Each structure stands twice: as structure tokens, then as C-alpha cells.
């Protein structure tokens, strides 16, 4: 799991929420596939609304230019973001995201390697509504500040606990990575973050950094599928 702090600025979060306050939300079950429909109880912004499409495009632009998203996911394709809303008592039980998704209004499909939630409601404004992800270390509960995001493997079982007070609004999307192997993708992320840390602290010689960059890019070249 990768937490991305301040993916959106406070002003951007405010703009997103103001726009979403005026768009229609449909029953989230209408977009659930398979068994997920039986445990999904939320609202989802109408993806055909031009205002929602503008917000989705704005978020896509932010994702495509975020260094942590690029490093952690190595994106090949990103699904147009969806916006959901959980009011009091609404929840989404344990489910796994579909492996293959058709990109709306195109003949293209996407393999979901990584899932992302971008939190748009300040966490102090609602109770409950935690994203719970099953990992090899047990359940991990996530509730980020507004504007922050979490990136995690799409193969994970996960749920959103019932909102007991207030309202939770978030954006969700899925990413097809150039590196489909989860373990190798995580290793590449760790290597890249270590290189960036050495660059930032200025303790490594240029020759050493060149050597590490050489290893990193050759590993990406070997394991990527484009």
C-alpha cells in the first residue's frame, strides 16, 4: 500500500466538492459487477454528466503528473475516475475489484493491477467509512486526509465500513501497470524511492547514482509490457 499525501491541494478539494454537490448521484449497485452488487450500498456520480467528466479529466491529469503515482504504479492505462458518496448507514462489504474493465465509450479494456481511492471529505467530518484492506499482515484500516490518496493492489479483498455520522465522498480509479507482477512492481518502487532519497540528501556521488539509475531502468525494461 502506498499513501500519497496532498495529491490534491485544499483549494482543489474544495472545487471538487462544490462541483459534486450539484451533480446527480445514482445507486452505486448499477455499476457493480458480479457478487459485488450484493454488498454495495452507496451513491455514484453520474458518469455521463459533463461536470463529472470534467472532474474526472482533471483528476486524471493530476495522477499522470504525480511522481509517487508514476513510481509506485508505472501506469500504462488509468480508468476514468468515478466519484462515490456514502451517507449515514451506507457501506460496501468485502469484495475484490474486477480483473478486466472496459473503459467507458471506447473499445479498450484495462487490467486492474492497482486500485486507488482519493479522499475528498475531511476525515474529521464523518465517522466510520474506513477503507479496510486485507493484507498478508491482517486487516489494514485507512482513513486519509482530504486530498490524500491510497494506492493498493487490485487483487486485495477490501471493504468500506458503514458511515455512522456525516458523509464520505471520494474518487476511485484503477490502473493497469506496465509491470504486471506485483512483487517486482513493489521492488522497483522501493529502488526508485531509495534513489530519490539519495538524490535529495546529496550523499551519493554522481557515478554511484548513474549506476543505480542504470540498474533501475534496465529492470523496468526487462519486466515491463508495453
UniProtKB/Swiss-Prot annotation:
- Keywords of this protein's UniProt record, alphabetized? Dioxygenase, Iron, Metal-binding, Oxidoreductase, Vitamin C
User: Which terms under GO biological process does the entry name?
Assistant: DNA damage response; intracellular iron ion homeostasis
For 2-oxoglutarate, which residues are the binding ones?
Answer: 168
Quick one: which residues bind Fe cation?
A: 95, 97, 158
- CC cofactor: Fe(2+); L-ascorbate
Q: Which GO terms describe its molecular function?
A: 2-oxoglutarate-dependent dioxygenase activity; iron ion binding; L-ascorbic acid binding
Domain called Fe2OG dioxygenase: residue spans: 77-177
Write out the coiled-coil annotation as residue ranges: none
**InterPro entries, per the entry:** Oxoglu/Fe-dep_dioxygenase_dom, PKHD_C, PKHD_hydroxylase, Pro_4_hyd_alph, Pro_4_hyd_alph_FE2OG_OXY
Keyword Chaperone recorded = no
Q: How is the cofactor bound?
A: Binds 1 Fe(2+) ion per subunit.
What sort of enzyme, by top EC class, is this? oxidoreductase
Q: What is its EC number?
A: 1.14.11.-
Q: Which PANTHER family match?
A: PKHD-TYPE HYDROXYLASE YBIX (PTHR41536:SF1)
Which HAMAP family has this protein been placed in? Hydroxyl_YbiX
Q: State what protein this is by name.
A: PKHD-type hydroxylase MADE_1018490
Q: Please report the organism this UniProt entry assigns to the protein.
A: Alteromonas mediterranea (strain DSM 17117 / CIP 110805 / LMG 28347 / Deep ecotype)
